């Protein structure tokens, strides 16, 4: 009997109807497995213009849900911050000349013509001569590919060429790159007290300086704490491009000077490595798996992601609310806040995100609250009704402006954030987590 039954089953397997049924059953089984998987999988798209702080939001998620950063990552950030600190001080010295700010390190006695403070002047020269590439220890940084790419911006080419390399296209503001480089060379030599020869190759400043990290750190600290012109220039940093955490670097410069220094959490939150392309990060939060896609915010990066995402649970859009008076790194003719408004308008009303809820982070609120005391919002937004120093009215004004861009019925949730503040971000990210899990359950048909 067993043999007969076996033969019958074998013959049935050749029946096209049975084969089709089994194929359909297998497809349905796979679909059900995918549905079960998707109901616990949350996809977040992290977007925003360049310098908005979205990568800092991602760092907070790593701290809260992934156990933080590896030893290698902490070493890498130490190298990056050290290089940025040197470049930031060099930027302040150069920009002081362009803005007509007199530095204490350049003051001379009216009668003798001698420098009033020789030590300060030597500190300034030391910063100019420091070769940033020489300050990077690839071994201590782990020799990582991302770090090697990062330090390419310190290869000595002009600022215009740096931007062109970053963006992949030339700026069309009428400026001549060679002329701009000549201007920088002139300023460099003038500030250093040497005569301008017209050739940066023979410039005194092009000598490779072999100063130790401790000597360079001392020079930075001396200029930061004792040269009033440097502070005055820093207070006008919205008029040029300066690393957002420069003051933090300067205040802590001695620890970053140590080649074996291991960055703590706050150092990493303050440090910055530009996001290029799209990175995917996974976090296990309760029964759910969060997949967070962090996309580069500079203009040249956006075409890589603006149409690439389907099935996104929610979009987290980060806006640096404090940058209402600053210009883009990649195009110094365009206001950063204006750029964020245009970008948000495009995304909110894009067919790719027609039914996707948005979560807005009004980021860098702490900086905004201080900045509005000295930089009028009305200069850039003439319709702003508030007074100088009224941060609450300013926040409400921008929040209303962003919400008015929504021409659909999609939900928008707004949070005021300081992405470097772990305690406040713990609360905000907790609320966001609960929200997107609820949205995902609705999307899966469970709620």
Curated annotation (Swiss-Prot):
Lipid attachment, kind N-myristoyl glycine: 2
Ranges where the record places region G4 motif: 359-366
A GO MF term: GTP binding
Pfam entry (one): G-alpha
Chain positions covered by the region annotation G2 motif: 267-275
PROSITE patterns listed in its UniProt record: G_ALPHA
Coiled-coil region(s): none
Protein family membership: Belongs to the G-alpha family.
Binding partners and assembly: G proteins are composed of 3 units; alpha, beta and gamma. The alpha chain contains the guanine nucleotide binding site.
Annotated protein name in UniProt: Guanine nucleotide-binding protein alpha-1 subunit
Organism ancestry: Eukaryota, Fungi, Dikarya, Ascomycota, Saccharomycotina
């Amino acid at each position: 009997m067993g043999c007969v039954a076996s033969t019958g089953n074998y013959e049935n397997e050749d029946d096209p109807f049975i084969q089709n049924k089994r194929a359909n059953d297998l497809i349905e089984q796979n679909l059900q497995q995918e549905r079960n998987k998707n109901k616990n999988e949350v996809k977040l798209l992290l977007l925003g213009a360049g310098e908005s702080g979205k990568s800092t939001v991602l760092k907070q998620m790593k701290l809260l849900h992934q156990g933080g950063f590896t030893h290698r990552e902490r070493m890498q950030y130490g190298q990056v911050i050290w290089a940025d600190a040197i470049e930031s001080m060099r930027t302040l010295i150069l920009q002081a000349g362009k803005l007509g700010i007199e530095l204490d390190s350049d003051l001379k006695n009216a009668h003798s013509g001698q420098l009033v403070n020789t030590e300060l002047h030597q500190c300034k020269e030391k910063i100019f001569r420091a070769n940033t590439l020489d300050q990077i220890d690839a071994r201590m940084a782990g020799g990582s590919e991302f770090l090697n790419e990062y330090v390419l911006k310190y290869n000595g080419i002009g600022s215009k060429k740096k931007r062109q390399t970053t963006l992949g296209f030339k700026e069309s503001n009428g400026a001549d790159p060679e002329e701009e480089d000549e201007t920088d060379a002139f300023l460099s030599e003038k500030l250093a007290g040497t005569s301008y020869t017209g050739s940066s190759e023979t410039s005194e400043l092009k000598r490779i300086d072999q100063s130790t990290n401790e000597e360079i750190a001392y020079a930075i600290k001396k200029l930061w704490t004792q040269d009033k012109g440097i502070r005055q220039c820093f207070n006008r940093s919205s008029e040029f491009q300066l690393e957002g955490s420069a003051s933090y670097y300067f205040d802590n410069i001695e620890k970053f000077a140590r080649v074996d220094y291991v960055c703590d959490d706050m150092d990493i939150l303050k440090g910055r490595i530009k996001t290029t392309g799209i990175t995917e990060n996974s976090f296990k939060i309760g029964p759910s798996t969060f997949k967070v896609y962090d996309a580069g915010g500079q203009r040249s990066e956006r075409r890589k992601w603006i149409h690439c995402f389907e099935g996104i649970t929610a979009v987290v859009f980060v806006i640096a609310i404090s940058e209402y008076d600053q210009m883009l790194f990649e195009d110094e003719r365009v206001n950063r806040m204006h750029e964020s408004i245009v970008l948000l308008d495009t995304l909110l009303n894009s067919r790719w995100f027609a039914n996707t809820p948005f979560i807005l982070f009004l980021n860098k609120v702490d900086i905004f609250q201080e900045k509005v005391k000295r930089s009028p919002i009305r200069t850039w937004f003439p319709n702003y009704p508030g007074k100088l120093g009224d941060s609450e009215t300013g926040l409400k004004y921008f929040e209303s402006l962003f919400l008015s861009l929504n021409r659909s019925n999609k939900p928008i949730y707004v949070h005021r954030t300081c992405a470097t503040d772990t305690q406040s971000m713990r609360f905000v990210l907790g609320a966001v987590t609960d929200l997107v899990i609820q949205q995902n359950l609705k999307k899966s048909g469970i709620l």
